[in-house]
Curated annotation (Swiss-Prot):
Residues 141-164 are annotated as: Disordered. It comes from Arabidopsis thaliana (Mouse-ear cress). This is B3 domain-containing protein REM22. Coiled coil: none annotated. Transmembrane segments: none annotated. The keyword Nucleus applies.
Length: 276
């Protein structure tokens, strides 16, 4: 009886995830409303409460927004979702968007031209920019360095706390196995690295006690440590740096790979060495 109940719950969860994982939206100028209607039919996603704030990422341009999700009855919207996307994606004609949703708090989408159905692709030199709604959010140029943000006792509050970080995202994206995976550069002088809290929050990441590290030589395991202040550290990266003979001027990037795609649980970290 208990086994049948567990199977039923698993089936319901998978069904919910299947309906929201991928969907499409069409924008027509002067006809489409500012709020974006989402194919979610209740205030819960995969059995979890609807997140108030979500991250929306354009694969076509690199733009990133923090948006508010709201429910009206059984209908769910991204507040001003179309308004923000149309403005920042320079939309003047009808477009077709293909979305992927992780079921927790991150949306990715690609833009297709409505007439030709050609997929928009960004130049490798374009920067990722997070679009924010208030002073409580932080404007970020990319994930190259989060040191200034991580060490700040609190985010937002004044313009002095806002940060624009220089980017080398064109180099990073060229080396990733999947450009949609979260990634971050590593300080090669340390034996452990802090996984950026912004990355953890945006992708709703969770970690096992031990994680697989994969480089060009093979695989090994390293321990994940969570401090009392909730900071997440990956230990034992010094040996990875040494065995890959990383030279001064090179850059090391960790690409986080999750179970079954974008479901939050990190099971493997791919090591990428970017030569100077």
């Amino acid at each position: 009886m208990e086994e049948n109940s567990s199977k039923k719950k698993l089936s319901e969860t998978m069904s919910i995830q299947d309906t929201v994982l991928k969907f499409f939206r069409v924008y027509i100028p002067n006809q489409t409303a500012d709020d974006m209607n989402l194919p979610l039919v209740s205030d819960k996603i995969s059995g979890k409460p609807l997140p108030r704030k979500v991250t929306v990422k354009s694969v076509s341009s690199g733009n990133i927004w923090r948006m508010e999700m709201k429910a009206n009855g059984n209908t769910v919207f991204l507040r001003d979702g179309w308004k923000k996307i149309v403005k920042d994606e320079n939309v003047t004609e009808p477009i077709f968007l293909e979305f992927e949703f992780d079921g927790y708090g991150v949306f990715h989408f690609c833009v297709y031209e409505y007439g030709s159905m050609c997929k928009r692709m960004r130049s490798p030199m374009e920067k990722e920019v997070i679009k924010v709604d208030s002073e409580e959010d932080v404007l970020v140029g990319n994930e190259e360095s989060t040191k200034g943000l991580e060490e700040s006792p609190r985010r937002g509050g004044t313009s002095r706390r806002r940060a624009k970080l220089k980017t080398k995202s064109h180099k990073i994206y060229e080396h990733l196995d999947n450009k949609l995976n979260p990634s971050f550069p590593v300080d090669m002088t340390q034996n452990r690295t802090r996984i950026p809290s912004l990355l953890i929050k945006d992708y709703n990441l969770t970690f096992p006690n031990m994680v697989i590290m994969r480089d060009k030589i093979g695989i090994l395991k390293r321990r994940i440590v969570i401090w009392k202040n909730r900071s997440v550290y990956l230990n034992g990266i010094g040996s990875i740096i040494r065995r890959n003979h990383v030279k001064p001027g090179n850059e090391v990037v960790f690409e986080l790979k999750m179970v079954n795609g974008y479901h939050g649980l990190v099971h493997e970290i791919k090591v990428h060495i970017i030569k100077a």
